[in-house]
Amino acid sequence: MSSLDVHPAPSHRLYRAYARFGFLPTVLVILVVALALFVPRFLTVQNIFNVLRSSAYLVILSAGQMTVLIVGGFDLSVGAVVPLASVVSALVMVWAKGVAPDQTAIIVLLGVLAGIGSGLAVGLINGLSVAFLKVSPFIVTLGSLSIATGVALLLTNGIPVYGMPQAYVNGFGRGLWLQLPTAVYLAALIVALVWFIQNFTRMGRYLYAIGGNLQAATVSGVRTRTYLVLAYLFCSVLAAVSGLALTAQIGSGQAVISAQLTLESIAAAVIAGVSLKGGVGRVEMVTLAAFFLLILTDAMDLLKIDPRIQTIFLGCIVVLAVALDEVAKRRASVD
Amino acid sequence: MTDAIFVSKAGADRRRGLLDWLLILSLPLLMIAMELGVYAFEPRVLSLRNIVNVLNQSSYLVLFASAQMMVILTRGFDLSLGTTVSAISVASALVMTGLAAAGAPDFVLVAAGLIVGLGFGALVGLFNGFFVSWLGINPFVVTLGSLNICLGLATTISGGRPVFNVPDVFSLLFYNGVLIPGLSIPLMIAILVCLGLYFLLNHTVFGRSLYLIGNNPRAAYLAGLPSKRFLGLAYLACSLLAAFGALMLTARTGSGEPNLGGSLMLESIAAAVIGGVSLQGGVGGVGAVIMGTLFVTMLSNSMDLLEVGGYIQQILLGCVIIVAIFLDRLRLTRG
């Protein structure tokens, strides 16, 4: 802080601009350069391909989580919406295939709609409870997490659902456009959409306003309840989309998909500087943070670090990232 | 300060109407209704054996829910509780089996198990408390980090496998020994812990301060309370209670289990919140935790007796959590 005072104004401004983006891009660049230099297999096409694809799912999920965090909420249920959408879409596709085996387009459309519908249902429960009954988002989404997991398991008995149209699995899930997995384009599209909403629409501004100060937003005439419900709906729908993309890649509907998804999505958002108090968060940073997490995981895989030790490492990184952010913010406010 | 809290409580009592009493008694009434309803289909539910069984089962959850309450009172929560339990179970079992293999006498085994278990708990509590209270980081992020760290530790040091052959003397002392005929040791410990906590929360400066810190952190700070120290101590107390519960569970299973705490984090929060501990901080007590724990245990016991499947139980628990938070909201807005 004191060292900053002696700096002339231009570098001060530079520092401010730098602080606005945070340290994440720098850390990311250093990480990538270090990995490229010291881990030989990191810069292979196959590896970059893998990192991009696995990041895509987390980016979609974290963009949704960020939206809810911005309005001062939480969504623990995303980790259950992913398998729920997976199971529901697969079951509907298998059913539709039995009714009309030749209508692949309609089968896929029905499955996708059903999957997104299941996301909408969970989002509606979360959103309505938070907006109208004003109950803690933590508990509501804890409840819907339990419910959605139970429903997904009940529908399948925990057995994977096979028999989706090959066109869906090979064409979309495992397909490539211009050498890249389709999921990457889907994620890019969603990030662009969220970025547009955040920066150029009334809804985007309102979401920040609600998270910054709910009371003030209400008094200013923002229909806060509607926007709260929309935020939760949006988050669940993105989780469902992520589930659909994963299902298409795996080739079956799974009631048990990684239990860590919720935590990872929150970790990515938090590392990106999204405030858990609401009102702060940008989708481009969240995208970078999701990349950061998965590049790190990938590097540890390449270095043959035991996945169990990786867990410890990730835990430390989440806490450290936020601690650094907090300390930097305090300095800025003293400044 | 203590007086102020009591006075405002007494003031509210005078204005209580019929509906308020119904809300306060909703949980006990619901429990009685549930047990009578189940009795109609399955008389065994009210047999002495089953009631004793329910009480014994509750004695573990009540410890974890009380641990969770200590931090929820201060507007926090502890996501790391479940994996802390797993890590402690494994660590203490490893030390005890190692010493037993080296031929150490019984009292050394038990002492070593207790020291390692409680010491590990203290470390986790200090970690959480340090970051939450001194660095002012959101408890969600901090305990999310320690969740991952403990998960990694639990699976690494055990190699992912249970640690068998925990010395019989340990199980005798904390599980199946007989000190007072008719009263199991876990239940006795649970009762003692509840009495101790009741005293701590109601008759010590530390306990009363926790309520004020949760109700109004700014007022607590201005009143000159050592808020940071007390907040840190709350996390320490939480992890120590969890550690003790972990040792008792280890004594019951007779092995160190890396997955022991799997669902405990959610269950402990659910039990506390269903009992009426408010996530807004400052509301709750030992009585609330006992009621919540009994309700959750009775519900799962009744469903087991009625042979309801595990998936449906999960869905129902989710619904119960959401309903409980609605009731809590009603109570708060009327109070």
Residue ranges and their predicted role:
Chain A
Residues 24-37, 65, 90, 115-119, ...:
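Hydrophobic core segments of alpha-helical transmembrane domains in multi-pass membrane transport
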Residues 33-38, 43-97, 101, 128-135, ...:
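Single transmembrane alpha-helix segments in multi-pass membrane proteins
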Residues 239, 249-315:
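Transmembrane alpha-helical segments in multi-pass inner-membrane proteins
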Residues 1-31, 219, 223-226, 296-335:
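Cytosolic-side transmembrane-helix boundaries in multi-pass membrane proteins
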Residues 107-115, 121-126, 179-254, 265:
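Helix-loop-helix "hairpin" substructures at the membrane interface of multi-pass membrane proteins
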Residues 14-56, 244, 248-253:
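Helix-loop-helix hairpins and the membrane-proximal interhelical loops
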Residues 16, 133, 138-200, 227-230, ...:
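Transmembrane helix-bundle core of multi-pass membrane transporters
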Residues 98-145, 288-292:
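Alpha-helical transmembrane segments within multi-pass membrane transporters and channels
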